[in-house]
UniProtKB/Swiss-Prot annotation:
Protein family: Belongs to the UPF0346 family.
Domain of life: Bacteria
Name under which the protein is recorded: UPF0346 protein MW1311
S-S bridge residues: none
InterPro entries: UPF0346, YozE_SAM-like, YozE_SAM-like_sf
Family annotation (Pfam families): YozE_SAM_like
């Protein structure tokens, strides 16, 4: 199993031409994003309460689920 933070995974998603790619760009642009965390609750709370994230939380939920699958391989 891989040992990468959510932020490290998100950097692999940048450049996609979909909502997940746009969220990855917003996370990249947010200098205060918790780059070393991988806990769903910490990350979702941050996205809900900080920064100027414009996409629905369902995009984050889907991206986090993809992250957990990515960690397995």
């Amino acid at each position: 199993m891989k040992n990468y933070s959510f932020y490290q995974f998100v950097m692999t998603v940048r450049g996609r031409h979909d909502d997940k790619g746009r969220l990855a760009e917003e996370i990249f642009d947010d200098l205060a994003f918790p780059k070393h965390d991988d806990d769903f609750n910490i990350l979702s709370d941050y996205i809900e309460t900080h920064g100027d994230f414009t996409l629905p939380m369902s995009v984050f939920d889907d991206l986090y689920e993809e992250y957990t699958e990515w960690l397995k391989f």
